[in-house]
Amino acid sequence: MIESSQPPFCQADVSGSASVDLFGQPIIKNELLKDRFGEVPFTILDSRSGNWKKRKQKWLKLNIKSEVGRKDFNNSTKANNFANMNNDKYDIGGYHKLNSESGYASIFNPALAELLYNWFLSEGDEILDPFCGGSVRGIVANYLGYKYTGIDIRAEQIESNREQALNILPVNNQPQYYVGDSLIVLDDFKKHYDCIFTCPPYVGLEVYSDLNGDISNMDYDYFINSYKQIIEKSIDKLKVGGWFIIVVGEVRGKDGYYLNFCGKTKDIIINAGCKLYNEMIYITPIGAKAMTANRLMKNKKIGKIHEFVYVFRKV
């Protein structure tokens, strides 16, 4: 249990300096943008930088293990076959980690969650995550002073998330987790949230269970239909003026062509009552991509080392 009255990841004081020179003019401090905002607030978010790696390691020292709870996820089956067919592997807002239970599981980067929360939210804001998956986004949110509610269809994943949160956060500052299909669970939610912050599974590339309602195991057309309905119901629970933040990446179909998943995602959110406010490119580490570049280029495919972060606002 972390016992600290002041979390090490609090937002920087950006109120400016009260110091003045001999002529009464304000003295401008030589302050780096990354020190003021955590990272430079530009449209490129580079997780390969030294500053980013340091921030991520600080979070991992809290013993966040988002891959735990995925022992039924087998990358050697449908997900891996799909990826191998396309000669590619993907991250979703994070990085891959090998563990004995789950094989390679994508882990949401805690430094990305920290950055986006602090850039767009105010202390105490309430967050809804209809595709919560692992523990990262919930633990980071509540550690920073926000209030997170996540939904996942897999009971073992939610059990793991709750256990990790109890080991890291005070008992009176716990993320709220719900087990079930978001299409159904959201119908019972009465409150409205300040932010929706989520990262959906890649269709065909990340299969977490064979449960009915788990969109990760659906064919593309069924996936898009359920995905659309969940997003629409989530936006119904978003306050007017609230933020919808989503991390997504493009995927290829069985014919090798991109499916325009990112474009469809934007259309769904806009048609549900939001407007696109910011768009960022999140660069992931090259890692194993360097070893697959030759194979990819045989099929004229460029190795993908980026995701998109879309920030919408409900109007």
Which residue ranges define each predicted feature?
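Class I S-adenosyl-L-methionine-dependent methyltransferase catalytic core
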Residues: 1-315
